[in-house]
């Protein structure tokens, strides 16, 4: 089975191909006209190969979880979280590549994807927590938080592209053939969608996390760093989407993009803070009372 390094290299090669497309547009590395269609095809094949090996790795993790535990424990470690987030981001990239083949979206999405895969190599792969109960809610909680953070990351890429595109249009600088990006309307609507759905996902992750603790421990530690930050993130994302919607109604597109960028920064800081502390573990008091569990 492939390891994370395999698809890390595959995605890095795809990023190099995206850079080659950009350099061709600038005229610094001109390509023959006959080679350009082939470059686009190779780019798509490379992304598909990366996603395929990525998917095989995820399946291997699932089978390993099923063979070593009485229940499925996918998205139960920080390694799983980073790998699944990167996989979802890779799926989004390929979908965008098929829908917007002329746009150089990969220059903004692929670096974030590589950071997530690199992060997965640096964080522990051991499951968070000690108990095997409430596994369904653990899975729902992990999946919801993963989807939420992935969408915030994708929204960040859309926000950066919007700001670049708006700056060029404002300065009336030529952009066709240099750095081809989607329209401002597309980037704004996509960014708003990412912010809205990420808020819903984080909120569902918060609720499922509370239920998981109630089922597993019979209580909820409301001062737990994970719960506090999840609640704070949900409140921020709801507030950010409301502010963004107000900006949309007033025609302030750049401010809507900045809300996506700011949301990504806040979520990234919160995730790093949660990573630095125990999360999802069975309380020590409960372990003392039930040494056999």
Annotate each predicted stretch with a short phrase:
Residues 132-146:
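Acidic/Ser/Thr-rich, low-complexity mid-to-C-terminal regulatory regions of eukaryotic proteins
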